[in-house]
A protein has these predicted regions:
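Conserved helicase motor core of SF1/SF2 NTP-dependent helicases
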Residues: 1-210
Length: 210
């Protein structure tokens, strides 16, 4: 029995291995299929984390439209709403860190924390700093975010937060342009990386970038 999600981030390997051995057993089973075929396995099609307004995007771009939200996830909301929002921030020449994005996220959190979160059981409470998760692809941006955001806000790389969740998530991309990307655009715009970052959100996800 093999369990897992090959469409999220892979384990980092420090070793050198022959070509093809970096793929998991599940990736070999999938082949070119976007999700596991019915004759090869069982696709767990229900998300207990993401509100439908978040889940529908992830389902479409990653899971071939097969993923949907459980009713309990659909009952969660914030006073600022649900879904995925794009926050453009102007900056130039940034490679792995952006003070401009840190300032914008700090401003948004200061406003959002004044609102409320309603859980799946119908209970409503004031949002607090620990209800916010800020994800970045680079350690340099993580350090800037930790220095510039309120204590209690969870900040880390995409890899660190795999498996975790929060009512509101920010994905700070930091890089100003493709020419400024220190690795390559395939890393920055990796489908698996975007999947993990956005799908941490129970209610609201903000994509913050140049």
């Amino acid at each position: 029995i093999f369990l897992g999600d090959p469409l999220q981030l892979k384990q980092v390997s420090q070793g050198i291995h022959p070509q093809g051995t970096g793929s998991s057993v599940l990736e070999h089973l999938l082949g070119e299929a976007p999700t596991i075929p019915e004759d090869r396995g069982i696709f767990l099609e229900r998300s207990y984390r993401m509100h439908p307004d978040v889940c529908s995007f992830i389902s479409e771009i990653v899971y071939a439209g097969r993923l949907y939200s459980d009713d309990s996830a659909a009952r969660r909301t914030t006073s600022s709403g649900t879904g995925i929002r794009f926050v453009p921030v102007e900056h130039e020449g940034n490679r792995t860190a952006s003070d401009e994005e840190v300032a914008e996220i700090a401003k948004l959190i200061a406003r959002l924390v004044q609102g409320t979160f309603t859980d799946s059981d119908g209970s409503t409470r004031q949002l607090r700093e620990t209800d916010f998760m800020v994800v970045a692809p680079y350690n340099a941006q993580v350090r800037r975010l930790r220095a510039g955001l309120p204590e209690g806000v969870r900040v880390g790389t995409v890899d660190k937060f795999q498996g975790q969740q929060a009512p509101i998530v920010f994905f700070s991309m930091a890089t100003s342009s493709g020419e400024d990307a220190p690795r390559n655009l395939a890393f920055l715009f990796s489908r698996d990386r975007l999947n993990v970052a956005i799908s941490r959100a129970q209610c609201l996800a903000y994509l913050v970038c140049s």
